[in-house]
């Protein structure tokens, strides 16, 4: 049974809740002392992991729609991508304001250059910014064929973002490895598409 347009609307409402609820949990954890002795790192990692989850969910939509024969499912992809950008922006903001501090924002540029994992992170964020700004149908019409070329940059983000996470942790744990493995699986599902680019 295929999803109807009305069901997709309700699914989008649910996905908006999924995107917003982690923010409520984070506020609750901050106010109730639910974070560790290093709350700044907790906030950075939580926002970064949530952004990664939405990135992976965005990449999952196309193969899921194809294999499940649910073409209307594609309509949720933009929404997931927007939430990915929201959480990536919260991740960047938490680093800039909580790690560096508002009085040291001038150091942000030098930090991004001197620390390679931060360089990967800001490249990923800038790519997501470009994708977000051009995610409308108006932008798609204006850019024409170039729109798809630009939005293929999401595959670069799918590589850089997990590497950024792996590189940022001082002690390697299973979590960043799992995210990287999931990203590789989702990219592998597009093997035929990548081969066509070479032709």
Swiss-Prot record:
Keywords: Cell inner membrane, Cell membrane, Electron transport, Flavoprotein, FMN, Heme, Iron, Membrane, Metal-binding, Transmembrane, Transmembrane helix, Transport. Its cofactor is FMN; heme b. It comes from the Bacteria. The chain crosses the membrane at residues 8-28, 82-102, 116-136, 153-173. It is a multi-pass membrane protein. It holds the Pfam family Ferric_reduct. GO terms for biological process: protein repair. It is found in: Cell inner membrane. GO terms for cellular component: plasma membrane. InterPro entries: Fe3_Rdtase_TM_dom, MsrQ-like. Binds 1 FMN per subunit. Belongs to the MsrQ family. PANTHER family: PROTEIN-METHIONINE-SULFOXIDE REDUCTASE HEME-BINDING SUBUNIT MSRQ (PTHR36964:SF1). Heterodimer of a catalytic subunit (MsrP) and a heme-binding subunit (MsrQ). Part of the MsrPQ system that repairs oxidized periplasmic proteins containing methionine sulfoxide residues (Met-O), using respiratory chain electrons. Thus protects these proteins from oxidative-stress damage caused by reactive species of oxygen and chlorine generated by the host defense mechanisms. MsrPQ is essential for the maintenance of envelope integrity under bleach stress, rescuing a wide series of structurally unrelated periplasmic proteins from methionine oxidation, including the primary periplasmic chaperone SurA and the lipoprotein Pal. This is Protein-methionine-sulfoxide reductase heme-binding subunit MsrQ. It comes from Salmonella arizonae (strain ATCC BAA-731 / CDC346-86 / RSK2980). The gene is msrQ.
């Amino acid at each position: 049974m295929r999803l109807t347009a009305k069901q997709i609307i309700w699914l989008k409402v649910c996905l908006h809740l999924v995107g917003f609820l982690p923010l409520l949990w984070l506020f609750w954890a901050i106010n109730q002392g639910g974070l560790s002795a290093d709350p700044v790192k907790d906030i950075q990692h939580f926002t970064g992991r949530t952004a990664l989850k939405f990135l992976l969910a965005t990449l999952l939509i196309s193969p899921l729609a194809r294999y499940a024969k649910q073409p209307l499912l594609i309509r949720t992809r933009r929404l997931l991508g927007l939430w990915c950008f929201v959480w990536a922006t919260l991740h960047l903001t938490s680093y800039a304001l909580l790690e560096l501090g508002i009085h040291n924002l001038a150091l942000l540029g030098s930090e991004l250059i001197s620390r390679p994992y931060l360089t990967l992170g800001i490249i990923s964020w800038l790519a997501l910014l470009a994708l977000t700004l051009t995610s409308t149908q108006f932008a798609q019409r204006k850019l024409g064929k170039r729109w798809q070329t630009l939005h293929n940059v999401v595959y670069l983000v799918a590589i850089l973002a997990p590497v950024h996470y792996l590189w940022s942790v001082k002690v390697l744990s299973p979590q960043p490895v799992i995210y990287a493995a999931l990203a590789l699986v989702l990219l592998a599902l597009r093997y035929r598409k990548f081969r066509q680019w070479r032709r």
